[in-house]
Amino acid sequence: MRRISIVLLIVFATSIFPFSIWNSAGESEYKNLLSIKKASKVGDILTIVIRESNNVSSERESLEIQKTLLNILGNVVNAAAGVNLNNFIPINNNSPERQRGGKVQSSVVAKISAVVVDIDPYGNLVVEGRKTIKVDKDYQEIIVKGKVRPDDIEIGNEVDSSKLADSEIWVNGKLVFSEEPGKESFFDKILAFLAGLFT
């Protein structure tokens, strides 16, 4: 008799409460019980981790670029003005002790909380974060904007700044960051080389 009453009680309880938390994942009160919460809609907050890559390139490569640029510059000046620059600028000064290898190091510079302000047609999250930091006695406001794929959001609701598409970093209202900050154009190398001649 006792077994029958327990069975009837279980049947009665399941008929009154027919839902299960395993089948009701779509309901807000049961959502993310077993999953990790990540930013997914407008208004959600995530953390952007800004890393600095210190790329110590080999001096041998740098000297080869300088030598090539000097040769090009010397040929242009020689053809245009008839002056041989090799008499004035030493080209073969790449001593063996200056030829070192290179390595890449990465370190966390800052973490900025960002808010999802929009979702583009492809499902990417448009984020914007602001942070005010004190440098000496001055305050500087940093604004980070960009798009994040939901798959790039890591555990802890963080995303690496290198994963931001169409990214912009503003400091005190001035744009200071382009899409590929570590990539130096050929024009930048020429300007850096010419500046190095006069310093």
UniProtKB/Swiss-Prot annotation:
It is found in: Cell outer membrane; Bacterial flagellum basal body. Its main location: membrane. Keywords: Bacterial flagellum, Cell outer membrane, Membrane, Signal. The keyword Signal applies. Assembles around the rod to form the L-ring and probably protects the motor/basal body from shearing forces during rotation. This is Flagellar L-ring protein. The gene is flgH. GO terms for biological process: bacterial-type flagellum-dependent cell motility. The basal body constitutes a major portion of the flagellar organelle and consists of four rings (L,P,S, and M) mounted on a central rod. It comes from the Bacteria. InterPro entries: Flag_Lring (IPR000527). Residues 1-25 form the signal peptide. One of its GO terms (cellular component) is cell outer membrane. Belongs to the FlgH family. GO terms for molecular function: cytoskeletal motor activity.
